[in-house]
Amino acid sequence: HTLLRRQRQMCIRDSLYPYMAPEGSYLLAKGRLFQLNQRDLEEVVQVQTDPLLFGRTPVLAVGSNRAPYQLLRKFGSEAIVPVTSARLHDCDVVHTALVSYYGAIPCTAFPSSGTITELKIVWLDEDQLLHMHKTEGIGVAYDYVEMQGVAHQLEVPVGPVFGYAARAGVLAWEDSQPAGLAAISAQARQFKTVRQGEVAQRVCKLTNLTEVWSVEQFITTMQTEKILREELIGQLQTHAIQPDQPPWRVIPVSMDGIDEYL
């Protein structure tokens, strides 16, 4: 019964993609959350041998990777992950033409002139970055990219910011335009926004599923039936839009061990 409750709780959380994230910057440290502002960052720097962000790679998190729940799921309860606030200019965050291994319809950045999205940057050490590559299905589901148009909200080390871009493209709606995530704050949006339940229903209608499932039923089935999930992803390609001249540069990465994340 406990396992069933846990599975249901996870399903409910997955239906709430991209999950709750604290306002502002924060530090996830061994399962606990701490607010992180400029003064805190400077104080942390003074009491450590190395600065908090030293040796870490800044990775823009446009969806679930900005949330403590997902970071805990990916890195475990002993992980230390600094997360800083950022704005992404001239892009919106929209739903992909993809179904993730955890059952949600994930998101990706997409060019949108004048739009400013409120996002996070996760600062990953070398091992965390390699594991993040795996969980993103690097080279198959997502490309690793160097982003443009990122504005930090704290003073952080100068250098490029990286991220992930969906290789399958983004899901087209009735107007042949993408649909943004209602849960992600943005200014001057050009695209309509929808919630995860609406996206799951659209995927059901666009593919060969015989009925429109509830979002919980959709997620549970996608988590457990990989062959069906792969079939749906293939069918969604006829409804996918690829970005034209995106503001990022692909960095070729290939690695083994990604099958369980596809």
Residue ranges of each PLM-predicted region?
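Acidic, glycine-rich loop-and-strand cores that form catalytic or ligand-binding grooves
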Residues: 121-146
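A short acidic-Thr-Gly-centered motif at the start of a beta-strand
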Residues: 45-55
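Short, contiguous, well-structured surface segments enriched in hydrophobic/aromatic residues
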Residues: 13-35, 88-105
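Single conserved hydrophobic/aromatic residue that forms the stacking wall/gate
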Residues: 1-12
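Short Gly/aromatic-enriched secondary-structure transition segments
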Residues: 72-83
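A structural-propensity feature for long, helix-poor, extended segments
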Residues: 95-122
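Short His-Asn-centered micro-motif
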Residues: 61-64, 124
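Mixed-charge (acidic/basic) macromolecular-recognition segments
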Residues: 158-254
